Amino acid sequence: MNLKILVGLFILGIIILSAMTFLNFTTIVAQDKGDQQPKGPIVYTYTEYNGTYFPHILTVVYYPCNATCSNLGFPSVWPVSNENQCHNAVVNTTCQALIEGVDWQLPLLNYVGGVAIPLSTPPCKLPWAQQLGVKGALVYYTQMVGEPLGVTLACGLLYATEDSMPGSITAINPVTGKIVWMANGLAGPAMNNPVVWHGIVYVSVGGVCFTFSQFVHFEDHQYCKIHRGRCGAVYAFNATNGQLLWMRFTYGEAMPAPAIYDGILAYVTGGGCFVGVNATTGQTLWVDHFPGFIANMASVNYYVLPNGTPLFIAGFTYTAPPYGYIIAVNGLNGHEAWNATMPAPYVGANTGLGDVAPAVDQQLGIVVDNDIANFSNGYVDMVTFALNATNGKPLWAVNTGRGPIPPAYKGGMPLIVGNVVYDGNPSLGTVNAICIKTGKILWSTKLPCLQTPPKFPGGPRGSPTYYHGLLWVSAGQYVYVINPKNGDILTFYWIGGRLGIMNPVIAGNTMFLSNSYGWIVAIPLSQIYPAYIYY
């Protein structure tokens, strides 16, 4: 009888071990490694999903002791890049510490296999600065190592990505700056703003590189065969503990952030794919193919038609004239609703409409975007334009100024507040206010101490943030505070490093910033501009 029990226990043990192996799931209790890593972290490792193996071991480390026990009052949804359709990244909070303002700096890159460079380091000391020059080194570190875009606040956590290879996503306690969980070993650089939907956080990955065969296609005028990045992927993680829920590989990179509406996750790729999936399960709902169209950094947005049908909207680069399109697809079936190019008389150039994520005014039914045009002798116009969100017809286009072509991300992400569009011109280092109904420039302000092309990358690229009656703008090494009524600069505050395509994210009296040098920074607004409370 005892022998039968022993045999039964042995067989049961084999079954349990087999199940754990099948799920590729491991739980490990690690040693104490300091303040950021308390005793007892839980480690999940994944080598495949649904029978398809990963290129890297995906390791998720969860530190439950670092999570906050209180309800911060954050939303459970962050559906698009920069929090909402208008790109105003302001989050309500009930947390007294955030309302009063917290102050911390986290060298995030150090925890995911990179090197967080001190924020006071001059650009000439960056990797490859001697070989590429200061401008090239700043762009390289943003594209290949640090955090290009801003952070996400949802479900009581702050989420940030790193595009150092392999890519990573990290969940951080926004009050203390301690890591709650991190997933390292993604199938490519994570270069965008994570989106969140009711307990699930999503990140898409992919690099900036082209294979040599793409240049052959270009030389042979085979533009429809060109795609960027051999492969990418989309991941869904449990927002609380980081467990992998599902993933799928993509044809071409998946650099831009996806968008979510009513349980549908829509993403685009460098292989000309526009894809809709079930946000909970990852199952395919529809797939569109646009041969030769390349998704760069223009994250997906959406507009809801009066009948309730969502349109997912994204920008694509094309390597021949007109160099870019904005495409809207029906979110229920994937059918193309409309496509648009830059309105005449402007002619798109270079990366075209694939860089800048469009903003959407749901109430007015307007899509706003920004791009370079009329390239000649190294100079371009920086054009902001508006389209009818229902049919894509042009409403207006305005030139915010001509200057040297900026490197890499060639535009300024627009913000819509009321009847005004605020966006940047990285070529000239200006912020512009534009009437959304007419396209009239209301004011234009040059940002002081911001180094611009042709010697430097310039800015601002990320959208401004409107809060407490003020505009908060990040560019170069500074955060600028601007009066939105007349464009007057009230103050500017040194952060250091490089504030690239990112936007300030605000909760209470606290601003959260990502930095290309590999840092996440929390700082009280009252430290940046004490008088803000009077606005």
Swiss-Prot record:
Optimum pH is 1. No activity is detected at pH 6. Keywords: Glycoprotein, Hydrolase, Signal. Residues 1-39 form the signal peptide. Its EC number is 3.12.1.-. It comes from the Archaea. It is found in: Cell surface. It catalyses: tetrathionate + H2O = sulfur + thiosulfate + sulfate + H(+). Coiled coil: none annotated. Glycans are attached at residue 50. It is an enzyme of class 3 (hydrolase). Its main location: other. Optimum temperature is 95 degrees Celsius. GO terms for molecular function: hydrolase activity. SUPFAM superfamilies: Quinoprotein alcohol dehydrogenase-like. Gene3D superfamilies: 2.40.128.630, YVTN repeat-like/Quinoprotein amine dehydrogenase (2.130.10.10). GO terms for cellular component: cell surface. InterPro entries: PQQ_b-propeller_rpt (IPR018391), PQQ_rpt_dom (IPR002372), Quinoprotein_ADH-like_sf (IPR011047), WD40/YVTN_repeat-like_dom_sf (IPR015943). Induction: Expressed in tetrathionate-grown cells. Catalyzes the hydrolysis of tetrathionate to generate elemental sulfur, thiosulfate and sulfate. Monomer and homodimer; in equilibrium. Belongs to the tetrathionate hydrolase family. This is Tetrathionate hydrolase. It comes from Acidianus ambivalens (Desulfurolobus ambivalens). The gene is tth1.
